[in-house]
Structures are given as structure tokens and as C-alpha cells.
């Protein structure tokens, strides 16, 4: 019974093959079923699904104009690391009598597969990386990227960059880049990353390149490896503005770019699949409806470009056999397919016809125009070039063999600008008086109405000119923006722009070189410089003799010597000039009848001193020079005193009515030379960066002190720095922008002041992300506001109109006020001293006179004992003359 059953099965099998053979040779020897092979490696699950689905689409959508043939497939999975597995898989396909093989290869399996194909004349259609080797029977579905990469390197003018390549695919491109580098004098650092298994090694490579100040990377790897590298880029914070990554891969939309996009780095890539192609859209519509149990990674995973190449490979195979069928080429296999390991190898006779037909195919697929050269390489194809911006990816142009790279016009940029009108722009800023402050009733308000200040008004005016909607966002860390020297990550408002969390920064943000490298600035809306803030010193009490301050000590000494000199000269010329002498009156009785009278002279030494003093005090006296020489002396002395007194009076008003404050510091040089007063800056900002980078000796000395000072002289916020100045009792100076310094001087308690000039010159600018479409519009708005004078009006409004220290009170070290007793106390002291001296001299004169009179009376009494007493009038006259001679008052006439 079993034998009969077995014989029945053998008969049925024989009948089946007989019918199949008759059907297979019904059209001039062309089979009705074309068997193709499939070789798939690991990580090609979706490609395997796309392969089977493409065959299914062809078999269910036949061209009715020709007698249809069906595609049949045989699939083997190979382990590329095992050469025996590769050989066994290929021989399995060859022994089945397949007409062509579709499959993948890598660097290890490529030589084995291409050798078998060449020896056995079996065509191998592959979407794997293209090779420059002139191999036969290999149809390369993937276009070469070498020309496109070189075109973009020239377009972006890269002269210094890093080339990270996969060992399996990068040698041909590496050779082309190195040849171009020699011709164009490029600096290229090439690193192979194909054999790296540890992700930490990627991180070490990126850190090493960053230490070399490398900002541009060309990454030539498969999608999975690119995703791994970009993940490390994000972790290290190297995806900020200023970095540019060119991804040498045809699946730009397959790469995970969401995290990198928000960092602000510029990313350029290539895309072979045009998602706007109706064929692509139709395929995807069917693709997403597939049962994922039958077609893994079809429904919930995006279509890879390698899957699209797989679909197109089936189109190419089908089109080639259509051509062979139309040409009535006999491609049928008769008998056994043979042994692939035979020595010598026995090639398939029809294999050359199939290879020729495959190379002659020209069809439109999901990857565009599909056409091959004589070596089976893609030709006459177009690759789209994409750029990743903060707002997303956009098509930047295209590349083909004839036109090379063709960038798109700025229409896309204008569209971005137009779209900004329809969305709310995020404006990052910082709480800093008077730029941005909370209103007193801010808790009852919402949105932008909660804030007030210079930058709030400026943002409103800019938005009005640019015609955008915006919302103010206070930066979370309260910092302006600096890059961490270790992690290289930007903080503050600059970080908000760099990492895509804000669109504009309207704040007192200084325009610096390091910031300009990662963000764009408008023209300055305010000019300023670094200045020194100290606590306002106590008003110096005027000295007792402050009335002497209008003239220097040297001038007073010269006046004293001039006074003495003029008096002596006047005395001498009066003695020498005969016109200063005159006879006594005839009515005057001579003192001694026996001696001739002496002609008197009014300008003795004491009278000369008295005359000079009276003229200097502008009071005059009873005597005046009579001679020409004496009058010349008096005239020049009067002229001298006129100028001196006028100058003194003019300065006296200012010195007595102005309270002066003595500042211990007047400049940065004063700070650098001393050690008693500490000084510092904001911990994160352009002021600190200025001192860190400065090459001026004074500033280098100051930076050396600041970075090593204990406790730290750096403050987290400006308010902390101001508070430290106020509490330090004059022992701390704060270095900050001059505009902020001037503003704080105008605020109560009015105890700070700006000293010295500005240390540098710079400006505040409105910042936008690198390459932002808003940059030009914002820049024009700032220029227009400046020309209209609105920027000056805003500064006056928030600095001086709302000042709390009086007009100019915080701006000047000198303050005019009413005179106090201390200002003129010295004058009263001199008055009291003069009165006291006069009383004392009078007392001395009285005592002296009394004593002299007593002696005279005794002498007279003794004389009377020897002589008769003289007449009374004669005695009185003699007494008077004696008294006169005692005092020597020659100017009195008797």
C-alpha cells in the first residue's frame, strides 16, 4: 500500500514538471515564471519586506499589453562575517536556477559575491554602497555620492574639516577628497570609524577634534552609525550654532535629527527619494496598510531609502526581462544549473544576455531616473540636497552630473520670514533694571504686560516694524551667555538662541567675537564701555583755611614775597627820589634851634608796608607816592592786585559753594596698583571675557588678581555686585557696563558713583540665531529707530526722567549747596585773631607808654632840682616831642 502511494506521488510530480516545462517554453523559449534570488544580511528586515512587497505588486499589476510572466523568489540569509555562510548562500541560489540575484553585501562579503557572479555569469543587483572597481555582472542601484560631496565642499567653501568615514565604503571618497585637498590647499583630518564598537570612542574622537577647534564634519557612514555619532554630538553639546555637519548618506530623512535640530547646528545631507513623487506617495499609501506580521517594519516604521532602492531593483529586473521577452531571447535554463564550486567554473550561457538587458534598462522609480553605464553604475540621476534649520529641514537645492550643485533661490527664506508673521516669536531677555523689570502690579497682569523697561519698549517697537507677534521669555538661569570651557555648552540668552529655544534676544547683550561666531547681531542700539563703580565717598569737610584753596600754595608764597618786595622797592625809590622829600611847615617850631631841620619823607619802611597792604586789600590809605618812580611802583602793584584778586574771587565762589568728594580710585591703573580695594565682574558675561582675553598689561594684571582672589570677586548677577559695593564701605569696586553704572547712580540710595573713563568701547545688539530669516528685518528696524531718535528718547526716559537722585546728581562728584559755617570758619578765625592781636598790641603800647612816661616824669623832677622850671608851654612842647620821637611816627606833622 505504501509502495503504491509512493508511486502515485512520483507520477504526479512528473506530470507537474512536464506541464511546467510546456508552459515555460510556450513563447519562443521564454519562461512564464522568472525566479530571482534574495540575499539578506542582518539589519535588513525592512528591505526584506520591501523586496517581497515589490514582487507582490508586480505580480498583481501586470502589463496587459504583453503576455505576463510571474516573479518568483528564493531568499537566503547570510552572515557576512562567515565566508562559508556567504558561499553556501550564493551556491544555494545558483543551484535553484535563479535568473538574477538581488542582495546586499558589505566589505567582507563583497569580493566573494562579485567573484562568484563574474565566474558564473550571474547578475547581482544590489542597493549596497557602490564600488569603483570595474566588476562585471554587478548592477549597483545606489548612486555614487563622490561628485555631490565635492560640489558641496566647494559651495560651502570648506577649507578645514574632519572626514569620518566607514571603512566599508569610504576609501573611494577619501581618495577623491585627498586629491581635491592637495589641489585646493584644504586641511582635512580623516578618521576611520567603521571598526569602532564602543560609543565612548566616538566621544573621544569628537572631543579631540574640538580641542583642535574643528567645527565642520563630513560623516560618510550608514544611517545607524550616523545616528550613533550624532547622539554623542548632542551629549557633548557640539550641536550648537557654529558647527556644520555634512552627512554623506542618501537617506537624510531617515536620520534622527530632532535633538540635533534644536541645538542650532547647520546640518546638510542628501536625499535620493523624492517624497513628492506620485509613485512614492502611492507606494507609501499601500505600505502603511500592510500587515506587520507578514511584512515586518512596514506599518509603523518610516520607509528607508534602501527599501526604496530595493523596490526599484525589482522594477529594473522586471523591465529587463520584459525587454528580453520582447526580443525573444532564450533565457530558459535546461537541465541542472550546475555546481558553483566546480573547477573550472562553468558559467551560464544566458547570463551575458541578462546582464546586458539589465544595463540597458531606463525606468522611473522611487529614486528618480534609473539608468546604468557599461559598468552597471547609476548614471543620469538627481540627488536632492537638504539643510536642517531650527524650524526643520528644507530642500536647499539639487545635484546632478551635468549641472552639478544647483542651490535654490531665497524664496524659501522669504517664505520662512512670511511664516513668522503667522506665529508667535519667542523673545528671550533678562531681568535687569532698567532694561526689563516687573511692574508693581505684575501679578494681576498676563503676558508681555507684566514687564516694563527699555528693552520692553524696544521689543515692542521692533515687533511693530517687523510685523510679528511675540512673547517675552525671561531666561531661566539669569545669565547673558557664556560657553563652559569644559563642556563647551552655552548658557544664558545665547544658549536659548543657540539651542533653538528662542527666536530673538532683546536685552543688554554685548556684541562680542565669540558670540558672533554662534549667533547673529543687529547693528548696536546702544554704545557703551566697561566702567568702574565704587561706593560714593563721604563728603570731605572743608578745612579751616579753605578760603585759601582757590590759589595754590606756591601762589600764596609768591604773593607774600611780592608784597614784601614791592614794599622794599617803594621804600627805596622814595628814599632816592628827591620828589618824595619835603620841608616842614614854617609855623612849626624847630625841635632844636641849633641844628638845621631834616626834610621829612612819608614812605618809611612801615608806611611802605602799609601802603602795599592797603592796595592789596583794595582799601587804600591816606598817603600816596608823589614821585614818578613811586607811582610806577604803585601802578604795577595795583594792576597785579587787580588780576590776583579778580582770579581769587572767581575761584572762591566755586570752591566755597561746591562740596568735594575725594575718590580713592580714579582709573583702572589705580585699581591695578593697589591691594586694599577688591574688584570684580559679573561671573558670566562679556566683561569677564574682556579681561580674560585682554593682552594689555594693566588688564592682564587685573585678570590675574580677579581669577585668584579669595573670596571670589565674581558675582552671579549685577544686583549682587551693586549690593557688594554698597556694603563694602569703599573696599570693593565693581566693573560693569557704563550704561548700567549710570543708571544705578540715579537710583536711591544714591550711594554709588562712576569713576574714570570707559575701559573699552562696544555696543548692545539684538541677537538672532545664526542664519535666521528675521535677522535682516530686525537690523533694518534698529537702524530706523536710531534715525528717528527713538533710541535716545527711550534712554532719557528710563535713565534720567525716572531718576531719583536729582538732575546730574548721580552723574557728578561735585554737588552745589548753600555755604555752611565750616566753609568760612577760617575768615572768622582771622577776624577774631586780628581783634585779639589788636587788643594785645594796644595793651602793650599802653604799658610801654606808661612806663616811658613814668621815667620821663622822674627825669623831669630831678631836673627841676637843678634848674628853674621852664615855661609851661615849653615843657608841654618838649614832652610832646619826646613822646613823638619814642614812637617815631614821622608822618605826623607838629
UniProtKB/Swiss-Prot annotation:
TM ranges are 553-573, 628-648, 824-844
What do we know about how this protein assembles, alone or with others?
Homotetramer or heterotetramer of pore-forming glutamate receptor subunits. Tetramers may be formed by the dimerization of dimers. Interacts with PICK1, GRIP1 and GRIP2. Found in a complex with GRIA1, GRIA2, GRIA4, CNIH2, CNIH3, CACNG2, CACNG3, CACNG4, CACNG5, CACNG7 and CACNG8. Interacts with CACNG5. Found in a complex with GRIA1, GRIA2, GRIA4, DLG4, CACNG8 and CNIH2.
Q: Name one GO biological process term.
A: long-term synaptic potentiation
Mention any additional remark: The postsynaptic actions of Glu are mediated by a variety of receptors that are named according to their selective agonists. This receptor binds AMPA (quisqualate) > glutamate > kainate.
Which residue(s) hold a covalent lipid per the annotation (S-palmitoyl cysteine)?
621, 847
Effect ascribed to mutating residue 706 to T: In MRXSW; homomers have minimal or no current; heteromers have altered desensitization kinetics
Organism from which the protein derives: Homo sapiens
Role, per record: Ionotropic glutamate receptor that functions as a ligand-gated cation channel, gated by L-glutamate and glutamatergic agonists such as alpha-amino-3-hydroxy-5-methyl-4-isoxazolepropionic acid (AMPA), quisqualic acid, and kainic acid. L-glutamate acts as an excitatory neurotransmitter at many synapses in the central nervous system and plays an important role in fast excitatory synaptic transmission by inducing long-term potentiation.
Name the positions where L-glutamate binds.
508, 510, 515, 686-687, 737
Q: Which protein, by its recorded name, is this?
A: Glutamate receptor 3
An example GO CC term for this entry is: postsynaptic membrane
Q: List the disulfide bonds.
A: 91-340, 750-805
Which medical condition is this protein associated with? Intellectual developmental disorder, X-linked, syndromic, Wu type: A disorder characterized by significantly below average general intellectual functioning associated with impairments in adaptive behavior and manifested during the developmental period. MRXSW patients have moderate intellectual disability, and additional variable features such as macrocephaly, seizures, myoclonic jerks, autistic behavior, asthenic body habitus, distal muscle weakness and hyporeflexia.
Amino acid at each position: 500500500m505504501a509502495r503504491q502511494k509512493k508511486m502515485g506521488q512520483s507520477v504526479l510530480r512528473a506530470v507537474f514538471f512536464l506541464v511546467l516545462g510546456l508552459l515555460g517554453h510556450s513563447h519562443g523559449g521564454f519562461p512564464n515564471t522568472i525566479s530571482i534570488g534574495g540575499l539578506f544580511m542582518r539589519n535588513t528586515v525592512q528591505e526584506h519586506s520591501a523586496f517581497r512587497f515589490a514582487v507582490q505588486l508586480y505580480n498583481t499589476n501586470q502589463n496587459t499589453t504583453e503576455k505576463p510572466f510571474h516573479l518568483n523568489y528564493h531568499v537566503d540569509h547570510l552572515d557576512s562575517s562567515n565566508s562559508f555562510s556567504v558561499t553556501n548562500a550564493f551556491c544555494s541560489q545558483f543551484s535553484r536556477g535563479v535568473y538574477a540575484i538581488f542582495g546586499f553585501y558589505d566589505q567582507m562579503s563583497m569580493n566573494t559575491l562579485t567573484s562568484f557572479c563574474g565566474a558564473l555569469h550571474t547578475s547581482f543587483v544590489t542597493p549596497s554602497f557602490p564600488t569603483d572597481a570595474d566588476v562585471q555582472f554587478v548592477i549597483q542601484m545606489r548612486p555614487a555620492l563622490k561628485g555631490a560631496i565635492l560640489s558641496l565642499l566647494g559651495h560651502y567653501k570648506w577649507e578645514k574639516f574632519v572626514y569620518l568615514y566607514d571603512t566599508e565604503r569610504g576609501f573611494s571618497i577619501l581618495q577623491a577628497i585627498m586629491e581635491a585637498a592637495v589641489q585646493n590647499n584644504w586641511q582635512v583630518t580623516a578618521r576611520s570609524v567603521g571598526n569602532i564598537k564602543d560609543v565612548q570612542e566616538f566621544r573621544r574622537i569628537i572631543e579631540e577634534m574640538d580641542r583642535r577647534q574643528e567645527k565642520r564634519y563630513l560623516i560618510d557612514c550608514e544611517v545607524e552609525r550616523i545616528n550613533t555619532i550624532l547622539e554623542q554630538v548632542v551629549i557633548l553639546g557640539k550641536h550648537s550654532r557654529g558647527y556644520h555637519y555634512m552627512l554623506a548618506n542618501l537617506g537624510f530623512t531617515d536620520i534622527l535629527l530632532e535633538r540635533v535640530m534644536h541645538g542650532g547646528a547647520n546640518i546638510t545631507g542628501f536625499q535620493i527619494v523624492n517624497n513628492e513623487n506620485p509613485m512614492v506617495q502611492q507606494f507609501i499609501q499601500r505600505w502603511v496598510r500592510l500587515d506587520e506580521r507578514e511584512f515586518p517594519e512596514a506599518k509603523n516604521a518610516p520607509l528607508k531609502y534602501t527599501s526604496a532602492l530595493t523596490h526599484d531593483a525589482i522594477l529594473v529586473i522586471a523591465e529587463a526581462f520584459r525587454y528580453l521577452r520582447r526580443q525573444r531571447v532564450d533565457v530558459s535554463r535546461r537541465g541542472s544549473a550546475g555546481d558553483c564550486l566546480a573547477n573550472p567554473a562553468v558559467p551560464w550561457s544566458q547570463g551575458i544576455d541578462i546582464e546586458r538587458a539589465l544595463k540597458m534598462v531606463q525606468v522611473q522609480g522611487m529614486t528618480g531616473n534609473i539608468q546604468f553605464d557599461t559598468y552597471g553604475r547609476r548614471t543620469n540621476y538627481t540627488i536632492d540636497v537638504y539643510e536642517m534649520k531650527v524650524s526643520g529641514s528644507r530642500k536647499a537645492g539639487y545635484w546632478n552630473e551635468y549641472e552639478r550643485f544647483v542651490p535654490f533661490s531665497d524664496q524659501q527664506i522669504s517664505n520662512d520670514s512670511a511664516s513668522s508673521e503667522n506665529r508667535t516669536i519667542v523673545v528671550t531677555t533678562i531681568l535687569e533694571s532698567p532694561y526689563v523689570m516687573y511692574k508693581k502690579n505684575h501679578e494681576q497682569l498676563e503676558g508681555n504686560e507684566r514687564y516694563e523697561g527699555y528693552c520692553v519698549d524696544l521689543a515692542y517697537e521692533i515687533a511693530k516694524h517687523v510685523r510679528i507677534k511675540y512673547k517675552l521669555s525671561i531666561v531661566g538661569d539669569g545669565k547673558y551667555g557664556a560657553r563652559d570651557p569644559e563642556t563647551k555648552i552655552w548658557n544664558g540668552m545665547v544658549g536659548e538662541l543657540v539651542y533653538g529655544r528662542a527666536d530673538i534676544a532683546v536685552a543688554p547683550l554685548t556684541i562680542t567675537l565669540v558670540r558672533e561666531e554662534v549667533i547673529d547681531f543687529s547693528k548696536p542700539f546702544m554704545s557703551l564701555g566697561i566702567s568702574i563703580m565704587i561706593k560714593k565717598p563721604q563728603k570731605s569737610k572743608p578745612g579751616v583755611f579753605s578760603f585759601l584753596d582757590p590759589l595754590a600754595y606756591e601762589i600764596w608764597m609768591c604773593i607774600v614775597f611780592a608784597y614784601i618786595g614791592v614794599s622794599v622797592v617803594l621804600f627805596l625809590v622814595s628814599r632816592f627820589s628827591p620828589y618824595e622829600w619835603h620841608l616842614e611847615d614854617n609855623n612849626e617850631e624847630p625841635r632844636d634851634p641849633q641844628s638845621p631841620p631834616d626834610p621829612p619823607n612819608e614812605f618809611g619802611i612801615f608806611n611802605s608796608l602799609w601802603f602795599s597792604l592797603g592796595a592789596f586789600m583794595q582799601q587804600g590809605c591816606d598817603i600816596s607816592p608823589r614821585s614818578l618812580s613811586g607811582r610806577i611802583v604803585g601802578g604795577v602793584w595795583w594792576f597785579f592786585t587787580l588780576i590776583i584778586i579778580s582770579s581769587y574771587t572767581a575761584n572762591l565762589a566755586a570752591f566755597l559753594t561746591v562740596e568735594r568728594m575725594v575718590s580713592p580710585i580714579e582709573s583702572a591703573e589705580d585699581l591695578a596698583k593697589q591691594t586694599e580695594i577688591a574688584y570684580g565682574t559679573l561671573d558670566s558675561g562679556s566683561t569677564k571675557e574682556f579681561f580674560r582675553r585682554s593682552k594689555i598689561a594693566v588688564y592682564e594684571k587685573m585678570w590675574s588678581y580677579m581669577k585668584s582672589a579669595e573670596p571670589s570677586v565674581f558675582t552671579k548677577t549685577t544686583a549682587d555686585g551693586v549690593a557688594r559695593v554698597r556694603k563694602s564701605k569703599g573696599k570693593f569696586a565693581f566693573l560693569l557696563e557704563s550704561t548700567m553704572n549710570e543708571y544705578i547712580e540715579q537710583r536711591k540710595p544714591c550711594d554709588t558713583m562712576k569713576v574714570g573713563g570707559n575701559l573699552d568701547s562696544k555696543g548692545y545688539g539684538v541677537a538672532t540665531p545664526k542664519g535666521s530669516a528675521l535677522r535682516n528685518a530686525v537690523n533694518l528696524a534698529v537702524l530706523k529707530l536710531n534715525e528717528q531718535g527713538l533710541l535716545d528718547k527711550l534712554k532719557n526716559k528710563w535713565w534720567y526722567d525716572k531718576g531719583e537722585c536729582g538732575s546730574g546728581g548721580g552723574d557728578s562728584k561735585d554737588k552745589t549747596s548753600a555755604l555752611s559755617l565750616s566753609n568760612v570758619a577760617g575768615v572768622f578765625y582771622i577776624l577774631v585773631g586780628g581783634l585779639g592781636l589788636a587788643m594785645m598790641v594796644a595793651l602793650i603800647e599802653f604799658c610801654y607808654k606808661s612806663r616811658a612816661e613814668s621815667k620821663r616824669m622822674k627825669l623831669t623832677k630831678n631836673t627841676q632840682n637843678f634848674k628853674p622850671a621852664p615855661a609851661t608851654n615849653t615843657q608841654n612842647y618838649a614832652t610832646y616831642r619826646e613822646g613823638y620821637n619814642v614812637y617815631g611816627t614821622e608822618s605826623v606833622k607838629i
